[in-house]
């Protein structure tokens, strides 16, 4: 996945916005799952891509398989630059 803003899908942008708004959690594992507002995202492949691209990360270390609040990395903030707040 490219981290260039023009290369992100609308779904990826919406997921990043949810993380930025503090509404998302990551399941800590080698393939981190994402849930928003307590519900699993329908596109976990994109969630994995966002984590592996270094755009999102958990706010704290937890045991493997446990959930932690998600936050944007510096790269994640840069990727959202230029997109309006409303999805």
What are these regions (language model features)?
Residues 32, 63-64:
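Residue-level "edge-of-site" marker
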Residues 65-87:
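Short, amphipathic alpha-helical interaction segments positioned at domain boundaries
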Residues 7, 37-58, 64-67:
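Short amphipathic alpha-helical interaction segments
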Residues 2-45:
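Short amphipathic alpha-helical interface segments
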């Amino acid at each position: 996945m490219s981290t260039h803003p023009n290369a992100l899908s609308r779904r990826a942008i919406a997921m990043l916005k949810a993380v930025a708004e503090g509404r998302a959690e990551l399941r800590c594992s080698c393939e981190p799952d994402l849930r928003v507002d307590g519900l699993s995202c329908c596109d976990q492949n994109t969630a994995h891509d966002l984590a592996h691209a270094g755009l999102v990360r958990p706010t704290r270390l937890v045991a493997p398989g446990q959930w932690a609040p998600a936050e944007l990395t510096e790269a994640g903030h840069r990727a959202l630059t230029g997109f309006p707040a409303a999805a």
